[in-house]
């Protein structure tokens, strides 16, 4: 093979298939909090199917289970885990007020 053509060939990378996040024995249910919590973001939002690497049917079942858990108060609708750090409050100094007429 010509040296100039060798530069444009793609290198062979090993392909490793990722394991599916839901096994065949896992039941998608609103009571299975350990499974449901994997598919929720830090803000409490349901992650997309592309991020989760789920099939369409699995994503639908996960979404329904999360919504049921929220309605039954097992899961919060919003996750306020991030507490805002309190910064030192700077007292406002207002000078003497003058009226402009």
From Swiss-Prot:
It holds the Pfam family Ribosomal_S18. One of its GO terms (molecular function) is small ribosomal subunit rRNA binding. GO terms for biological process: translation. Transmembrane segments: none annotated. One of its GO terms (cellular component) is chloroplast. Residues 1-23 are annotated as: Disordered. This is Small ribosomal subunit protein bS18c. The lineage of its organism: Eukaryota, Viridiplantae, Streptophyta, Embryophyta, Tracheophyta.
């Amino acid at each position: 093979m010509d040296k100039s053509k060798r530069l444009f060939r793609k290198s062979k990378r090993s392909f490793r298939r990722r394991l599916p996040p839901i096994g065949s024995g896992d039941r998608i249910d609103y009571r299975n909090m350990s499974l449901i919590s994997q598919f929720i973001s830090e803000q409490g939002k349901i992650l997309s199917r592309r991020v989760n690497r789920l099939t369409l049917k699995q994503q639908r079942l996960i979404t329904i289970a999360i919504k049921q858990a929220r309605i039954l108060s097992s899961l919060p609708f919003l996750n306020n885990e991030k507490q805002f750090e309190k910064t030192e409050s700077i007292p406002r100094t207002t000078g003497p007020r003058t009226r402009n007429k």
